[in-house]
C-alpha cells in the first residue's frame, strides 16, 4: 500500500487543495498542505507509540487521557469563546460517559487497549467536532441576536431561558453532519470503520455490525455533548466578549 505512487498522489492532492483554497476561496494557499504534512507527522508518531502502548492496558489509558486533553483544548479553540472554553471538557466527558461504560459493561467492546483506543478515538473525535461547532454557532447566534435576548429579559424571562431560545437552532444544526452520515450510510457513504473491517476480515456482516455500533455510539455521545454545551452557554459558563 505504501509506495511512491501513494506519496505522489497525496502531494498532488494537498497542493491542489491549497491552490483551490487560495484562488477561488481567497484563503491561505498553505493551509491544506501544512495540515497534510502535520497529519503525516502526527499519524506516524501515533502509529509508533500505539505499537507499544496498545500492548498494555495502563499505557492505553495514558493514550486515552492524552487524546481527551487534546480534544478538549481543540474544542475550546474552535469555539472562539473568550471565557469558559475549559468547560467544553465537561461536555466531552458527558458524551463519552454516556457511551463508553455501556460498551464496556456489556462486553460489546473488549476491555483491551487494542479495542478500546480506536472506538474511544472515533467517538471522541465526533463529539469534539459537534461540541465545538455547537459552542461556536451558539455564541455567534447570541452575538447576532443580542436584541432578542435583551427583549426576553425585559419581559421578565430568566437569562437561561432567554439565551436558550436563541441558541436552540444552532445546537441542533451541530448534529446534522453525523445524522446525515447515519441516514446515508451504505447508500451514499461507506464509513471508515466499515471499510476497515471489510478489508481486514472480508466479512460484510462483521463490518456492518462494527459500523452500526460506531454510528449509534456517535449519535448518543454527540447529542449528550451538545446538550451540555447548550446548558453551559445558556447559563453563561461559556461566553464570548459582547456575546
Task: Give, region by region, the residue ranges found by the protein language model.
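Loop-to-helix entry region at the N-terminal start of transmembrane alpha-helices
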Residues: 2-9, 60-64, 80-134
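Short cytoplasmic-facing helical segments at TM-TM junctions of multi-pass membrane proteins
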Residues: 137-170, 174
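Alpha-helical transmembrane segments of multipass membrane proteins
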Residues: 18-19, 47-49, 68, 72-73, ...
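C-terminal ends of transmembrane helices
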Residues: 17-30, 71-81
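Loop-to-helix transition at the N-terminal end of transmembrane alpha-helices
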Residues: 30-58, 62-65
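Transmembrane alpha-helix interface motif
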Residues: 171-243
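Alpha-helical transmembrane segments and their membrane-interface exit regions
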Residues: 66-75, 120-128, 217-219
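Membrane-embedded alpha-helices of multi-pass transport/permease systems
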Residues: 124-149, 228
Amino acid at each position: 500500500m505504501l509506495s511512491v505512487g501513494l506519496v505522489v498522489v497525496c502531494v498532488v492532492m494537498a497542493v491542489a487543495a491549497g491552490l483551490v483554497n487560495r484562488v477561488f476561496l481567497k484563503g491561505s494557499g498553505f493551509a491544506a498542505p501544512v495540515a497534510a504534512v502535520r497529519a503525516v507527522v502526527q499519524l506516524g508518531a501515533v502509529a509508533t507509540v500505539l505499537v507499544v502502548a496498545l500492548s498494555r492496558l495502563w499505557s492505553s489509558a495514558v493514550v486515552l487521557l492524552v487524546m481527551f486533553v487534546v480534544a478538549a483544548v481543540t474544542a475550546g479553540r474552535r469555539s472562539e469563546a473568550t471565557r469558559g472554553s475549559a468547560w467544553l471538557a465537561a461536555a466531552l466527558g458527558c458524551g463519552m460517559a454516556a457511551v463508553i461504560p455501556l460498551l464496556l459493561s456489556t462486553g460489546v467492546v473488549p476491555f483491551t487497549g487494542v479495542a478500546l483506543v480506536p472506538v474511544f478515538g472515533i467517538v471522541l473525535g465526533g463529539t469534539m467536532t459537534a461540541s465545538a461547532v455547537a459552542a461556536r454557532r451558539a455564541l455567534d447566534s447570541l452575538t447576532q441576536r443580542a436584541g432578542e435576548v435583551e427583549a426576553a429579559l425585559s419581559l421578565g424571562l430568566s437569562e437561561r431561558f432567554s439565551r436558550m431560545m436563541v441558541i436552540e437552532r444552532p445546537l441542533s444544526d451541530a448534529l446534522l453532519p453525523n445524522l446525515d452520515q447515519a441516514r446515508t450510510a451504505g447508500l451514499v457513504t461507506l464509513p471508515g470503520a466499515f471499510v476497515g473491517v471489510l478489508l481486514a476480515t472480508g466479512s460484510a456482516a462483521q463490518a456492518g455490525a462494527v459500523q452500526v455500533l460506531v454510528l449509534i455510539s456517535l449519535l448518543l455521545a454527540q447529542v449528550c455533548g451538545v446538550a451540555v454545551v447548550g446548558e453551559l452557554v445558556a447559563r453563561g459558563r461559556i461566553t464570548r466578549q459582547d456575546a
